[in-house]
Amino acid sequence: FYGASTIMRFGKNMNPTTLSALAAFPSQLEAHYAAIPPAFRHWTPPSWEGVPSEAFTAIEQLCHVRDIEIEGYHVRFRRTLQESHPTLASIDSEPLAAERNYGAADAAKVLADFRLARVQTMEIISSLSDAQLPRTAVFEGYGPLTMRSLIHYLCSHDQQHLAGLQWLAGKIDASTVAQ
């Protein structure tokens, strides 16, 4: 997705491991989704106890990641850069999933839209100056943070959803065991 030289150009005062993870995530997300058997992409387990992400089916995980990238992090980045210490909203994901009928989404389109959004995210990050990384905001549920913090939280969100897809894969496999 992005080569090492591009990541280094993005680097400035950002951790290159974080930047590499952000750049690699679209391919990882697609691979994790592809590993879910097609018959289980809309499947829900009998219990969501222990899920490391929101309680979403595999297709719903994709839609959520796309929407949080665009309507969550793009907006948060813009506001943190343009406003003085803004309060950044947390998005209530479950009503959004129901309203947008995530379960009926076309995975290929969702993944393509997400890839484009992540390119835009990496462009935003690559354009940041050293003076912009410490800009501050308050994020609902997280408290005070910096622009740099937001970038780390986005990377954490990515990893949370890879873990959610792995958790679903484990539950799918466990569902084949007789009770």
Locations of the language-model features?
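Aromatic-glycine hotspot motif
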Residues: F1-I59, D67-Q179
